[in-house]
Structures are given as structure tokens and as C-alpha cells.
């Protein structure tokens, strides 16, 4: 009795031993994975309308074997993957979601054109891919109307560009700005329009000018630059037409002499004039009667005595 009285206070406050199959925390918090369960025939009276699918709801496809998932534990969130919707599987879904899923999977030939949101096959259907790759028709712009006469065999000169978008009064200013990107060989101004065709010395200079498309000059003029497609301008200039003019920026103008170097006209006396004057007939002749100092003994004695 004494041993039982000593043990009794300890056993009264301690919890009873847990049962073999009881758990205090849900399995998803303990990191337990759902164990695979072999498919078993189930009656229609069981709750689980997600597993009951007819061929009509599946879009006419033959019925597939349904693998039921184990029953979720109390208080646990759903454990199915988010990719189950993409695969078209209704396993682990509620009955309401299982009814909506077959309708989302059924696609008619026109469903790709309608683009119903929420359907995955719209992004991968051949009809939608064909619509994405279809090019839009050419827009109506001045360059497109000029390019009607071009064919695939025509080869354009890449050194030509077309500058447009400036008022006619600022044509010389724009031409001076584009002269900073390279050596301009020729340029053709439009008589009535707001564009001009410019030819550079190299293709690299033309590409540098093409990169200035959309640049604002003088804080008021936005300029557009495109490759020149006016083949008539290129052909007329190649034949030596008088409509072209060579533009050289004043900053890069070299200083050339006004007369050829082969025939110099100088007003300065050449350096050889002094040598020619020394050999002329007029020379200074020394006089023979020029007095000289006497170096004799008597003159030295007189200079010593009298100080002469």
C-alpha cells in the first residue's frame, strides 16, 4: 500500500499513455507524405463525386482509371499539386471544380480563335500559333508608296539615307548636323517636301546617321532617318545629273593655296641675291696710297721720348 501511495501522486498528474495509432499533430506538419493507395472499386453512395466522371464530361475521351487519394486528415490543407489543373485531372478536387474542369478541357476548332481565358490549350493550339506568326499588312506611309516599284532583285546603295521631318527653312541646319557623322558626298533636297536624300562616303557613316532616328535637334525639331529607297535618285546621280551637289562642312574644309605650287610668285628677295652681288663688276678696290704705321727703330725711339 505504501508503494502504491507513492506512485499514485505521480500518475494522477501525468497524461495517459497514447494509443498506438493516435497522433497529436496532423501529418502534413510532421512532413508525412500521403501513402499510395491501390485503386479499389467504390460504390456510388460514397462521398467523392470528383472521381465519378462520364465520357461525355471528359470531352469524348475514353474513361481513365481513377486513383483515389487517401482521405485528408482533419485540419490539413489540400495536398494536390497546382499542376493537376494543367493535366486535366480531377483527382483531389471538389465536386464543383470537377464539374467545371471538363468544360474547360473541351475545345472546339473555334475556341482557339475566341481565346477563352483560363484554358491552357489556347496558348499551345496551332490556330493561336498561326495568328501570332501572321504579319500585319503594310501601313500606308510615304516610304511604302515609293517602294511599290522595287522588286526583290533590286540592290540599293547602303550609303544613301533619307532625312525627313524638318521645316524647309531648317534644311541647311539639319544638313550641317548630319555632316558631323561622316563625309557627305551628295545630297538632294526636295522641292516641295520636308525630306532630303544624303549619300555618305561609307556604309559605316550611313549606319551612324541611321542611329539618330528620332533625335531632337535645336530642342524643337524631331528628325526621322530611314534608308533611302528612291532608286531614281541614286541612278540619276550616278549618271552625272546636275541635280546633285557636293556638300563639304566648313569645319572640315582644308586650306588650299590660291595658286599652284609649281609656279610660285614671291615678292621677297631670294637668299642667293647676296652671292650674286659679290660676283658683279662693281667692287670696292683698295687704294695703294693709304698711310700705314711706321714700324722702324727711329719711330719707336721718337714715340718713347716724345710720346708720339
Swiss-Prot record:
Q: Does the keyword Glycosyltransferase apply?
A: no
Recorded hits in InterPro entries, A to Z, give: Nucleoporin_NUP53 (IPR017389), Nucleotide-bd_a/b_plait_sf (IPR012677), RBD_domain_sf (IPR035979), RRM_NUP35_dom (IPR007846)
Query: Which cell locations does it reside in?
Result: Nucleus, Nuclear pore complex
Which GO terms fall under molecular function for this chain's record?
nucleic acid binding; phospholipid binding; structural constituent of nuclear pore
Pfam families to which the protein is assigned, alphabetical = RRM_Nup35
Keywords of the record, alphabetical order, are:
mRNA transport, Nuclear pore complex, Nucleus, Phosphoprotein, Protein transport, Translocation, Transport
Ranges for the region named Disordered are 1-80, 242-265
Give GO BP annotations, semicolon-separated. mRNA transport; NLS-bearing protein import into nucleus; nuclear pore organization
Q: Where does the record place the RRM Nup35-type domain?
A: 155-235
Q: Which family does it belong to?
A: Belongs to the Nup35 family.
Instruction: Supply the name of the protein.
Output: Nucleoporin NUP35
**Species of origin:** Danio rerio
